[in-house]
Amino acid sequence: MEKDEEFGGISDAIEISASWSKIKGIYYEIEKYFNQRNIVVASHFSHAYTHGISSYSIFYVNREDEQQAIDEFYKIWNDIMELTLKMGGSISHHHGIGMIKNKMLKKELGPGYGMLRDLKDAVDKNNILSRGKLI
């Protein structure tokens, strides 16, 4: 960014999924989270199945200070992931984990994370495939 450019804020989409019995509660808690912080959010549901559905929350953080906006951006991601897991949802659906959600994967998978680690070690003994990106 050029020094004379004005910082406009940060926008992103958070994708989560949950069973039908849990999605309503998670959705309302996510909306409440953003509304309490006066953060613009637009959410929608997609990819519905007999066992559950995915939800997207597109948010926009606009602060005068660029670093403050960046810090808030990462706090939002962490808080929404924690909230989703606490309420029994999943931190992803079909878009994968990625770098931001990576630190929450172990928490979501529990003991299954060790199995995934062992599989990666067996297939990639030299640790050259996506080093540090997933596990």
Q: Would you name each region that the model predicts?
A:
Residues 11-14, 99-105:
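Short beta-alpha connecting loops at secondary-structure transitions
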Residues 88-94:
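Basic polyanion-binding and macromolecular-assembly surfaces
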Residues 46-54, 58, 94-102, 132-135:
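A glycine-rich phosphate-binding loop feature that marks nucleotide/adenosyl-phosphate handling sites
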Residues 74, 82, 91, 110-113:
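Long, contiguous binding/interaction regions
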Residues 1-79, 83, 87:
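C-terminal substrate-recognition/cap domain of FAD-linked oxidoreductases
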Residues 101-135:
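Activity-critical C-terminal alpha-helical subdomain
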